[in-house]
């Protein structure tokens, strides 16, 4: 039985990527990605945690952190060498968010990733009122055309994020009109992602 990597094994050296676990997780230092990584680690699955700053990735049994940046194609391709299944958490909101997503998806396909699980958004569409849902739609379309098999997890707004939104008068301002929303806990989103990643072939879209 091989010993699990120690914290000292955390690395940002892409040259070692080919010998690392074939299940890769982005966003592991965040809420959904962190929950996903923890639950998969508890199942005994070896993980490759992709992070801009590997030292910020959680220290989990069987997990190794590797430096990876969505916009840095060369670093991404090295980090994804030998990866079979990839969990892609969307990049932080920015003007070039879609460009980062496209670059990352292209690098994943070029690196030989077989299956990608993408954390998308409910009702992703090119004309969505919620502008970020448009980015998710175009990311989904690019993944579909990439040649990789895929699973799209379409979350709604996070319940534990809503408490951070009200202004000083208790209002949440946004382009929703009289619309309603069905929220989801980030912990639950992570549990679903972990279940899919543990058996991705069962959930191909």
Question: Which residues are covered by each model-predicted region?
Answer:
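Rossmann-fold cofactor-recognition segment
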Residues: 61-72
């Amino acid at each position: 039985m091989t010993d699990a990597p120690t914290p000292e094994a955390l690395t940002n050296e892409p040259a070692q990527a080919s010998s690392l676990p074939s299940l890769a997780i982005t966003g592991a230092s965040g809420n959904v990605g962190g929950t996903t990584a923890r639950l998969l680690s508890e199942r005994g699955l070896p993980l490759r945690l992709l992070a801009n700053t590997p030292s910020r990735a959680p220290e989990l049994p069987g997990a190794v952190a590797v430096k990876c940046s969505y916009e840095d194609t060369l670093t991404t391709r090295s980090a994804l060498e030998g990866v079979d299944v990839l969990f892609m958490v969307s990049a932080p909101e920015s003007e070039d968010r879609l460009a980062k997503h496209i670059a990352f998806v292209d690098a994943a396909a070029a690196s030989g990733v077989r299956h990608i699980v993408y954390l998308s958004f409910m009702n992703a569409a090119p004309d969505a009122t919620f502008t970020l849902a448009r980015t998710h739609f175009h990311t989904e379309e690019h993944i579909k055309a990439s040649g990789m098999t895929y699973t799209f997890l379409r979350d709604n707004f996070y319940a534990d994020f809503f408490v951070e939104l009200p202004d000083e008068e208790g209002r949440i301002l946004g382009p929703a009109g009289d619309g309603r929303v069905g929220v989801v806990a980030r912990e639950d989103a992570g549990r679903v992602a972990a279940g899919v990643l543990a058996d991705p072939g069962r959930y191909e879209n």
